[in-house]
């Protein structure tokens, strides 16, 4: 059997504390929805920069150099 350490006991108590439990109600859905919206906004901004429909002053996009 392995040796018990203070760090191992601490990590075990943190890691297994919520295993198998389901949070009642909405849980983490609002947090995940917010993160999803942020990701969507980020992707739309990238698409607009790629299509040059988002005009940025002093920033030129040259995709010919990217290979």
Curated annotation (Swiss-Prot):
One GO BP annotation is: protein stabilization
Q: Name one GO cellular component term.
A: photosystem II
UniProt topology in membrane: Single-pass membrane protein
* Single GO MF annotation: phosphate ion binding
State the source organism's domain of life. Answer: Bacteria
Q: Where in the cell is it found?
A: Cellular thylakoid membrane
The transmembrane segments are 27-47
Could you tell me the keywords of this UniProt record?
Membrane, Photosynthesis, Photosystem II, Thylakoid, Transmembrane, Transmembrane helix
Under the heading InterPro entries, the entry gives: PSII_PsbH (IPR001056), PSII_PsbH_sf (IPR036863)
Q: Which HAMAP family match?
A: PSII_PsbH
Share what the entry says about its subunit structure, partners included. Answer: PSII is composed of 1 copy each of membrane proteins PsbA, PsbB, PsbC, PsbD, PsbE, PsbF, PsbH, PsbI, PsbJ, PsbK, PsbL, PsbM, PsbT, PsbX, PsbY, Psb30/Ycf12, peripheral proteins PsbO, CyanoQ (PsbQ), PsbU, PsbV and a large number of cofactors. It forms dimeric complexes.
Which function does this protein serve? One of the components of the core complex of photosystem II (PSII), required for its stability and/or assembly. PSII is a light-driven water:plastoquinone oxidoreductase that uses light energy to abstract electrons from H(2)O, generating O(2) and a proton gradient subsequently used for ATP formation. It consists of a core antenna complex that captures photons, and an electron transfer chain that converts photonic excitation into a charge separation.
Q: Which family does it belong to?
A: Belongs to the PsbH family.
Kindly give the NCBIfam families that the UniProt entry links to this protein. Answer: PRK02624.1
Report what the protein is called.
Photosystem II reaction center protein H
**Organism, scientific name:** Prochlorococcus marinus (strain MIT 9211)
The organism's taxonomy opens as:
Bacteria, Bacillati, Cyanobacteriota, Cyanophyceae, Synechococcales
């Amino acid at each position: 059997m392995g040796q018990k350490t203070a760090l191992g006991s601490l990590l075990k108590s943190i890691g297994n504390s919520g295993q198998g439990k389901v949070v009642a109600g909405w849980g983490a859905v609002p947090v995940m929805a917010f993160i999803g919206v942020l990701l969507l906004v980020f992707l739309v901004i990238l698409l607009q920069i790629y299509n040059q429909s988002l005009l940025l002053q002093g920033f030129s996009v040259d995709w010919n150099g990217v290979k």
